[in-house]
UniProtKB/Swiss-Prot annotation:
Entry keyword set: Ribonucleoprotein, Ribosomal protein, RNA-binding, rRNA-binding
Any coiled-coil regions, as ranges: none
Subunit relationships: Part of the 50S ribosomal subunit.
One matching Pfam family: Ribosomal_L22
One GO MF term attached to the UniProt entry: rRNA binding
Protein name: Large ribosomal subunit protein uL22
GO process annotations (BP): translation
Function of the molecule: This protein binds specifically to 23S rRNA; its binding is stimulated by other ribosomal proteins, e.g. L4, L17, and L20. It is important during the early stages of 50S assembly. It makes multiple contacts with different domains of the 23S rRNA in the assembled 50S subunit and ribosome. The globular domain of the protein is located near the polypeptide exit tunnel on the outside of the subunit, while an extended beta-hairpin is found that lines the wall of the exit tunnel in the center of the 70S ribosome.
Length: 130
């Protein structure tokens, strides 16, 4: 089983909005996920698209380094999660000398691509045959 990891940190999109996009692609084939992200209207879909493409390139390089064959259509998103990054705190002036805080949140996004094991293929085939 080939596994490749790609991370992007300090992306200026709120974790809540990024999680909506990541939930759409979790468990899907990598090429299918790229197609979904390409046409998704959410703003977080662009950095996640680039991240999945980077993870696919990482898998390609890893397979070349170990002289093993990698079928890119077999890659699927094994794990994908969004963690909260640092928060940029800004202040907006208000009436009578007051200031309201504005939190500009950032995200750390991680995507793990993998090829299915023989055991994974057997269990999915068994479930499909019922």
């Amino acid at each position: 089983m080939v596994e490749s990891i790609a991370r992007v940190r300090h992306i200026r999109v709120t974790p809540q909005k990024a999680r909506r996009v990541v939930d759409m692609i979790r468990g899907k084939q990598a090429e299918e996920a790229l197609a979904i992200l390409k046409f998704a209207p959410q703003g977080a879909s662009e950095p996640i698209y680039k991240l999945v493409a980077s993870a696919m390139a990482n898998a390609r390089v890893k397979a070349d380094a170990s002289n093993s064959f990698l079928a890119e259509q077999d890659l699927y998103i094994a794990k994908a999660f969004v963690d909260e990054g640092t928060t940029l705190k800004r202040f907006q002036p208000r009436a009578q000398g007051r200031a309201f805080r504005i939190n500009k949140r950032t995200s750390h996004i991680t995507v793990v691509l993998a090829t299915p094991d023989e055991a994974d293929v057997a269990t999915t085939t068994k479930k499909a045959s019922k």
